Amino acid sequence: MREEAATTLGKVGHADAGAALVEALGDDYWQVRLRATRSLGRLRYAPALDALIETLGHRISTLRKEAALALGELNERGAIAPLLAAQDDGDPEVRKAVRIALSQLQ
């Protein structure tokens, strides 16, 4: 249920949605964090920059991949250095997402 809420918040685009989604990045369930990460990227919620950078280092590769894609959508220059550092990720899907994100930031 919280997964769907995170997805819906990303579609609504209400001003308070971004803050709620950043809070959802700390949820106990990784699926909720995944949906929140996607939604933050969709909203281009710049205040989520630091939280998404932190998610870029998560142990679950799917979250790292989505964080990279969301960082690309934010279009914030502060994401470049962490994305460059993530180019060596052990997961090829994460590396692909990092390349996509970096191309969006150029």
Model-predicted regions and their roles:
Residues 46, 58-65, 69:
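Strongly charged, low-complexity linkers/loops
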Residues 1-2, 31-33, 62-64, 92-95:
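Positions within the helices of HEAT/ARM-like alpha-solenoid repeats
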Residues 14-26, 45-57, 76-88:
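Amphipathic alpha-helical scaffolding segments comprising HEAT/armadillo-like alpha-solenoid repeats
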Residues 75-106:
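Leucine-rich solenoid repeat scaffolds
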Residues 8, 39-42, 70-73, 77, ...:
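Core register positions within helices of long alpha-helical scaffolds
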Residues 3-7, 11, 29-32:
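Acidic (E/D-rich), amphipathic helical modules within compact regulatory domains
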